[in-house]
Regions:
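Polyanion-binding surfaces on beta-sheet-dominated domains and ring/shell assemblies
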Residues: 1-116
């Protein structure tokens, strides 16, 4: 049984046109926001991203680490995204690293980081 969703999460989702039912799923008792919902909220919030900085890239080893900076109004946040065989089963580690980095930045800018 999932724990109750934090009221702050519901309020922030609503502010950016999302509902918990459509935007979230319960991952073993922890609420997680779907990537597609994060992308929609980022667009609605006017979040923009700088060109990512590649920290490590190896197609042969299927590893990618990037640093992404995003801006919303006058605030900026940055975060890493990483993918390797140890934490990624997909055949596209570079796209997965980008997704993870951008999602983390958006969660920080929207005030959801650490909540969802």
């Amino acid at each position: 049984m999932p724990r109750a969703l934090d009221k702050t999460i519901s309020e922030i989702l609503s502010k950016y046109g999302e509902t918990p039912k459509e935007a979230c799923w319960d991952c073993h008792g922890v609420w997680v926001v779907y990537h597609k919902a994060i992308e929609r909220m980022a667009a609605r919030a006017g979040i923009t991203f700088d060109q990512p900085t590649v920290i490590e890239a190896s197609a042969a080893n299927k590893t990618a680490v990037i640093c992404v900076t995003g801006t919303m109004a006058d605030r900026s946040e940055w975060s890493f995204g990483e993918a390797s065989p140890a934490n990624n089963k997909n055949a596209y580690p570079f796209a997965m690293a980008e997704k993870r980095a951008k999602d983390r930045v958006v969660l920080k800018l929207l005030g959801l980081h650490g909540l969802a």
